[in-house]
Amino acid sequence: IIDQCVAQGVPFAREYGGLLDNRSFGGAQVSRTFYARGQTGQQLLLGAYSALSRQIGLGKVKMYTRHEMLDVVKVDGRARGIIARNLITGKIERFAAHAVVVATGGYVNTFFLSTNAMASNGSAAWQCYKKGAYFANPCMVQIHPTCVPVKGDFQSKLTLMSESLRNDGRIWVPKKLEDAKALQAGTKKGKDIPEADRDYYLERRYPAFGNLVPRGVASRAAKERC
C-alpha cells in the first residue's frame, strides 16, 4: 500500500539516505508509522485524487460531482445500481451497474461533534442497510482526540489537529481546581501555571505509552478531566 501511495505521488518523509522515514504514533510503542510531516491524511487524499484525475483524463472513469445517493437498486437480490439526486438541478437520476461499491467513508456526523466532512452523515450506510446489506460493529467508529473546538459562527465542525502533536508534545491539565477555573475565565494563561501544578495525566496513568496511548484511551481520559 505504501509503495502504491508513493507511486501516486504521496510525499512521505525520508531519511538523509533517501529511505522512507518512520515515527511513533498513537497505540504503538515502536516507530513504525510512515508520515508526511503533519499532513499525512491530506497528502494521502491528494495522492488518491491525483490518481483518480488521471483515470478520468484517460477516459476510464466518469465522475459525477454534486450527486447524493438516495437508494440502492436491487435486482434478483443483488445490488445493480443506485438512485441519486443532482444537487445542482435537483433532478433524480438512476445509474445501472454490474456491481455497486460503497466507499462513502464513516458516519461520525451522527454524533454531535466530529472532525469529519459534513457529508459523512450515515445516510449511505443506512440506505444499504435497509436493502439488506450486513452492518457489522456499528460501535467501532473512529474518532480523533486532538482537535480545535467549534468557536464562532464560521466554524461548522471541529478542526482536526494532527496526531503528531501527541508525538511531539505533552498533554496536561491543571492539578488545582482554581487554576482550571482561571483558565476558563481567561484570567490566567497556561504558561503561567508552574510545572509542579500540571498533571500530565496520560504519562502518569499509562507510563508505557505516555501521550501515545490509543485514541479511545486518550479521549476517555480527557473526558474524565474536562
Locations of regions flagged by a protein language model:
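Conserved FAD-binding subdomain of flavin-dependent enzymes
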Residues: 1-11, 130-136, 141
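Conserved redox-cofactor binding core of oxidoreductases
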Residues: 4-91, 103, 147-162
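Hydrophobic alpha-helical scaffolding
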Residues: 34-42, 114, 118, 161, ...
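Glycine-rich nucleotide phosphate-binding loop and flanking beta-alpha elements
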Residues: 90, 107-109, 142
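Short hydrophobic core segments
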Residues: 94-105, 128
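Flavin (primarily FAD) binding-site architecture
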Residues: 102-116
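Gly/Ser/Thr-rich active-site loops/lids in small-molecule metabolic enzymes
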Residues: 118-132
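An anion/pyrophosphate-binding glycine-rich loop and adjacent beta-alpha core
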Residues: 127, 133-226
